[in-house]
Structures are given as C-alpha cells and as structure tokens.
C-alpha cells in the first residue's frame, strides 16, 4: 500500500487488530520511505440488491440516502447517531439476507418505517407523512391512532 504522506510504495503492517464486532480489521502500517505510521481499515465488500423505484427505474442502494432520510425524520429528536447507525445496520442486514438482486423501494420504505417506529414515534409520523403521501389531517390522525394503539 502506498504511503499517504510521501507516496512511497513500500509499507509494512506493524500491528493488526480485529474490531470487537468482527466487522472490520484495523491495521497500523509503517512507511519504508519516511517511517511515518498510519492506520487502515479493512472490511469485506458487500453488495446490496438494486432498488426498484415506483416508476420502474433501478438505482444502486446508497447508505447515504438512507441516512439522510433518517436524519430528516429525526431532526431535533432525542435519537443518537449511534442509534440511527444501528437501525441502518439492521436494515442493511435484512437487505443482504433477502438474497435477491432487486428490492422494491416500497419494501425498503417499510423497513425504514419499522425501525423509526421503534426509535421515535414523532420521527415515524414525519417519515410516514412523506412516504405515504399524506393529503390531509385525517391521514396524520390515522397514523397517530396506529402509533397510540398498536395491534
């Protein structure tokens, strides 16, 4: 691996550690040219199914888009970044476990709603209002009743 400081092509791994959750490997490297040390992270490459939009277009799954949706729904709510990341990890695990090459955007939206309902009811209602295209106050009332009286 090339040194990020001097671009020397020869670096040596001086320490390797696996993350607590086993999701990645942390390596400390030392440059053979300038002797500076730097850290790299190695994680397995994972492919996700393509997302099929309502109009039939197929787009690549983008974690950043999902994160953006969570952040909008949970803006100014008492939900930590760690909680959001954990919710996204659960969704990504479900997507991987589907074993399918494509997934409907509506199915992904339902996964997001399930996670938001567990994290924060207000965030859930905010997301539902856009996702389900609320048109009037009755739509909000119906979802609020659903949140108050699950089952």
UniProtKB/Swiss-Prot annotation:
Q: Name one GO biological process term.
A: negative regulation of DNA-templated transcription
The entry's keywords: ATP-binding, DNA-binding, Metal-binding, Nucleotide-binding, Repressor, Transcription, Transcription regulation, Zinc, Zinc-finger
Annotated cofactor note: Binds 1 zinc ion.
Its biological purpose is as follows: Negatively regulates transcription of bacterial ribonucleotide reductase nrd genes and operons by binding to NrdR-boxes.
The family database entries (PANTHER family) matched by this protein are listed as: TRANSCRIPTIONAL REPRESSOR NRDR
What is the gene called? nrdR
HAMAP family found in the cross-reference section: NrdR
Domain ATP-cone: from-to ranges: 49-139
Q: Which GO terms describe its molecular function?
A: ATP binding; DNA binding; zinc ion binding
Extract the coiled-coil ranges from the record. none
Task: Note the superkingdom of the native organism.
Answer: Bacteria
Similarity annotation? Belongs to the NrdR family.
Question: Which protein, by its recorded name, is this?
Answer: Transcriptional repressor NrdR
- What cofactor is this protein dependent on? Zn(2+)
